[in-house]
Structure formats: C-alpha cells, structure tokens
C-alpha cells in the first residue's frame, strides 16, 4: 500500500494519483487515455529520431576526432558507447536514491580497460548488476584518458581555460 497518497480531483486528469511505495519510491498512476496518447506520441518521436540518426552519427564521428578532451568529444564518446552497448544514460538522482548507475554517473572504479577492450561493471537500474564488454580502440583510448582525469566521475572534460567539469545526463 502507498503512503502520502495524492488523488486527482478531476475524473479525466492525466495524472490520477501519486504515492510513496514500501521501498520509499514515488509512484504515479496515469489515466488510461493519457497512457495511450503518450505511447502514440512516443512512436512518432521515434520515427523523427530514426530520420535524424544518420546526421547524429556523422556528428558523433566528427566530434570523436576532436583534439584534447573537450565536452563535445566526451559526449560523442558517450553516445557511441550507448549505441554500441545499449547502456542506459542514468542520472544522479537514481544514484543518490538507489545506488544505481548509468553511463553518465559511472565512476572510475566501474571500468577496466585492457588494450582495446573496455569492461564496465556496475549496479544498474533496479539493482541489476551490469557486466558490459566492448572492443573498440578509439573509445578505449578516450575512456582511458577520461579515467586519468582527477576526480571520481568517469566522464569529465576540460573547457577552453583548462577547467575540469563533470558530465550529467541532461548533457547527453
């Protein structure tokens, strides 16, 4: 049973109820018509994304060729990793609340690089342990350079002034 329950006063409100479950997670109950509409919209967004994908891939390749470790290169490496491994992007709130990680929240300790092989090992969504391997020389070099940047976050970049910054999920 949920605690701290809120129930919509409108019969046709898109959000019908919210509450906190036994594991202290906020849960949402949506109106069935809203769910159907969102699913249909999701399909059309996916079609637009499919049409944009070739250009995205060209931009990723261009950004991977940049010198140094600028933000664009790190984001391109992350997009390439997501495409090749199907890794979720993750976000800091899930890390804080559940101790689970995604690509944007990985730490140096979650990656082992030997030659051209990257081995990711971390607790993912819903506490499922992830073991992901990938052979790619260019990505291995870039991720190794990221790992060498001071700080616990794996994916960081240097700006034009040489200042270090972390990547968050919204940037990806």
Residue ranges and their predicted role:
Residues 1-101, 107-172:
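A positively charged, amphipathic N-terminal helix/segment that binds anionic biomolecules
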